Amino acid sequence: LLEKTDINLSPDFKNIDPANLRVKGDPKGEYCLPYAWGTTGIFYNEKVTGPITGWADFLAIPEKTGGKITMLDDMREVMAVGLIMTGKSVNSTDPAELQAATDYLLEHKAGVSAFTYDVAPLITSGDIAAAQFFVGLNVLTKPIDGLKYVIPAEGGTMYQEAICVLASSPNKENAKKFMEFYLRPEIAAL
């Protein structure tokens, strides 16, 4: 499926933090180039919600303040909240643990206004008070007094993005050149 690019042999690969070589199927970076990572947490308008430290505070917003909240339209991220709040691993595959997480989420479903990725306009307009979202939202929105981001005290998720080349790609050499372009320090800094 993936082409072995040997991107790890490029001179600028030395700038990749070894901690970012986390993919079990590519521990040396022979296939893919890790280029970004982030967290999933809670964006909130502190002027509406008051301080938020975690998922329990987030899920209590509708009842406590009347403010609206949204969660991601992403089964894995939403289930992660249920698993965290029931004390289980976000990577659990145990049917009983998944059911307990589902039950927890269903208990709080009525307070969730929408499951969406379209958070930026909702939070900047004040239509919602808080949202489960990726940390990158802070670069998508205009500065708003009171807008905060927190990684929940109970726990959150982390993601990593990588550039890979398909084995069936017709332009493998250009794809590798693009990966090497991303490795340039002045480009990576952007």
Q: What residue ranges belong to the model's regions?
A:
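Short, hydrophobic alpha-helical packing/hinge segments within bilobed ligand-binding/sensory domains
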Residues: 119-122, 138, 175, 187-188
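Short, conserved beta-strand edge motifs with alternating hydrophobic and charged residues
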Residues: 72, 131-134, 150-152
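A bilobed periplasmic-binding-protein/Venus flytrap-type ligand-binding module shared by bacterial periplasmic
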Residues: 39-48, 84-88, 159-174, 179-182, ...
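Solvent-exposed loop/turn segments at secondary-structure junctions
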Residues: 39-40, 47-50, 75-78, 136-139, ...
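Bilobed periplasmic-binding protein-like "clamshell/Venus-flytrap" ligand-binding domains
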Residues: 67-71, 185-190
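Extracytoplasmic ligand-binding site segments that recognize negatively charged/polar headgroups
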Residues: 1-127
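Periplasmic-binding protein-like
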Residues: 38, 98-106, 143-169
